[in-house]
Structure formats: structure tokens, C-alpha cells
């Protein structure tokens, strides 16, 4: 059997929107190798121009990785809070933040560098509301690798729009891996800046995905195309203008983008 045929037999189902295609396509992908099959043709993912695979509202969970929660534990138990939050702590990444893999993030003049958070996004295929953890993932299309960018800051207790809602600060991977083909119990990741590995690790969730979805859906409806970011590790390397960033999430694939300086007066 040809090597290419063997690779395709290892492939999994995913959903994507290559540029010039009007709809989300169901594709065969091999995330670890960066291979994709479109119209029967095997291509390298890096050679395809990708559009956004999801276009709904993006919500992010704070304090949902063990490393981040541990880092902020002293502040959570200090006045005026006195105890860790009992409910999910959310932020919103509005449409202006969305950028497909391969794009360029233009930093404003007041931002010297951007912190590169890596996470998994749960993408919904139908409305999900008031569900329990046992059925929470039934409404998912699948999962996508995400670069969740933010301006470095130390305070999680104020609205994070200025630090997290800037243009291009949510870089989505090329495809959504079908939920039946990915088990997001652990986040295993690597981040490179200018081709040099900046960090790698393994991260566990405070609330596992099903529990996190159920906790959020207890008070709001998550709609088709919406994305719930499950949390970022505390360690987030910094990228500056004129640098190239790549990250990988095991089982989901690779996200790439460039960092530039937004021109004065733009």
C-alpha cells in the first residue's frame, strides 16, 4: 500500500473552510503530520489558505487550568473575595479578534509584546442550554486549536477587554476535529517563536470540558458556531513585532501567525 494511502487511513474527520469555499467542508486530516485531503488530493495544511472554521461568539474561561489557578490562588482568597470563585469566570473575544491561521496580528503602538496563550476551543453545532455533564458534549461539532493572545497583565479582577479584545487576538486553527476523534482531558502543547521552542508542557483542567460546558450553559445558551476556550496555561511566552509564532496542540494540529506593528495613524 502506498505511503499516502497509509497516512489517509490514519486520518480523522474534521471540518474546515478553505478560502474560496463558501461552506464548512468535512475533511480527512492527519493533525500530527499536518496533512489534509481536499477533493481526494493530499495537501500539506501549510500550503492551503484557510478561512475561519467557526464564526460564532468566542468565550474564554479564566482560572480553568491548574497552573493558572495555582498562580492566582493567593489573590482569590484575599479580600474582598475570601474564596476561589464558585462559578466559571468568563471573558469574551468579540468578532474583531478572530483571525485564521496564517494571518498577521498587528500590535497597537501601546503594546510592546503580546502573550501567546495556547488552548482548546469547544465548537458548538447546535444550541446548548441547561445540560448536565453527561450530555454537555452532545451539542458539540468538535474541537479546535487556538492561540488566545493577550496584553501581559497581572489583574484578572477587572473587565479584560483592553488586554484580550484587540484585533486579531484569537487565532483559530485550520480545522475543527470531530468530537468523536479527540479527547480533551489533557492539554499537551508546544509553542515556537521564530522557529525556536519557547515552551511546551502538559496542562490539566480545573473543570474538565463536559463540566465546564455544563457550568456555563447553566446560565446562558451556547449557540451554533460559538466557541468556548477551555483555559490557557499560566506560562505564556511573549512575541514581538517582526516575529513568527507557531503552536501545536496534540490531536488538533498547528496554528501559525506573524506579529507586526500597526502603523502610526492607522
Language-model region placement:
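N-terminal non-catalytic cap/leader segment that marks the start of a structured domain
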Residues: 1-88, 180, 196, 244-248, ...
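Glycine-rich nucleotide phosphate-binding loop and flanking beta-alpha elements
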Residues: 65-67, 98, 130, 235-236
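A short secondary-structure junction signal
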Residues: 70-72, 102-104, 110, 130-138, ...
Amino acid at each position: 500500500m502506498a505511503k499516502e494511502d497509509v497516512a489517509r487511513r490514519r486520518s480523522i474527520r474534521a471540518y474546515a473552510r478553505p478560502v474560496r469555499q463558501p461552506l464548512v467542508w468535512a475533511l480527512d486530516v492527519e493533525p500530527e503530520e499536518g496533512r489534509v485531503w481536499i477533493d481526494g488530493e493530499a495537501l500539506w495544511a501549510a500550503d492551503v489558505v484557510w478561512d475561519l472554521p467557526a464564526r460564532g461568539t468566542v468565550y474564554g474561561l479564566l482560572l480553568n487550568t491548574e497552573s493558572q489557578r495555582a498562580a492566582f490562588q493567593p489573590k482569590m482568597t484575599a479580600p474582598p473575595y475570601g474564596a476561589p470563585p464558585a462559578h466559571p469566570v468568563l471573558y469574551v473575544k468579540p468578532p474583531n479578534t478572530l483571525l485564521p491561521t496564517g494571518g498577521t496580528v498587528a500590535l497597537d503602538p501601546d503594546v510592546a509584546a503580546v502573550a501567546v496563550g495556547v488552548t482548546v476551543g469547544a465548537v458548538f453545532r447546535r444550541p446548548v442550554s441547561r445540560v448536565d455533564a453527561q450530555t454537555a458534549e452532545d451539542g458539540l461539532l468538535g474541537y479546535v486549536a487556538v492561540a488566545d493572545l493577550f496584553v501581559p497583565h497581572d489583574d484578572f479582577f477587572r473587565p479584560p477587554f483592553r488586554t484580550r479584545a484587540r484585533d486579531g487576538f484569537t487565532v483559530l486553527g485550520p480545522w475543527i476535529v470531530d468530537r468523536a476523534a479527540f479527547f480533551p482531558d489533557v492539554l499537551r502543547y508546544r509553542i515556537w517563536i521564530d522557529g525556536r521552542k519557547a515552551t511546551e508542557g502538559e496542562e490539566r483542567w480545573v473543570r474538565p470540558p463536559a463540566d465546564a460546558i455544563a457550568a456555563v450553559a447553566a446560565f446562558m445558551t451556547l449557540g451554533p458556531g460559538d466557541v468556548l476556550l477551555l483555559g490557557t496555561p499560566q506560562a505564556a511566552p511573549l512575541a514581538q513585532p517582526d516575529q513568527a509564532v507557531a503552536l501545536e496542540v496534540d490531536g488538533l494540529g498547528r496554528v501559525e501567525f506573524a506579529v507586526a506593528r500597526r502603523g502610526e495613524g492607522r
